[in-house]
Amino acid sequence: MYRRILMAYNGTREGKTALVEAAEMTGFAQAETHLLSVATMPSSMFLTEGFLPEELIDEEKNRMQEVLDEGVSALREKGFSVTGHLAVGEPIEEICRLARELGCELIVVGHHQEKSFAARWWKGSIGATLLDYAPCSILVAIGRSTR
């Protein structure tokens, strides 16, 4: 049984699937559970001077705080004792950093599975990249493409 779990949550359908699947697994409710939402700043948002206005950063942090609060509430309704964490940065780096810092034994993420190879290649995958850097086991909840 896992004693400490980190769930990465971004509010997408796949993220919600991951929350539900983890909540339904026997024994997860007894684990020390942490929910992480990461406010990311896409490179397209950077201005020509190479920085982001503070207002844009604050907007993204506020948006992700709402997503985090939603996820924490959903898990608490299912009987979890959960601690929420908000980070700013690249999702892979922040997920791995917090998992190491907390000594997690499992990371739970959602993943949108594309049907076409070109779509998978173009978008990349947090789940696949996470496999290369995670300090512990990973549970990937799959959300299949409806196209």
Positions of the model-derived regions?
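Short, flexible loop segments at boundaries between secondary-structure elements
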Residues: C136-R147
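Structural beta-alpha unit
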Residues: S73-I107, S145-R147
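Short, hinge-like loop/turn segments at secondary-structure boundaries
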Residues: G50-E54, E101-G103, S125-G127
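Small/aliphatic-rich secondary-structure junction motif
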Residues: M1-F51, Y133
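A short acidic, glycine-rich active-site loop
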Residues: L52-E66
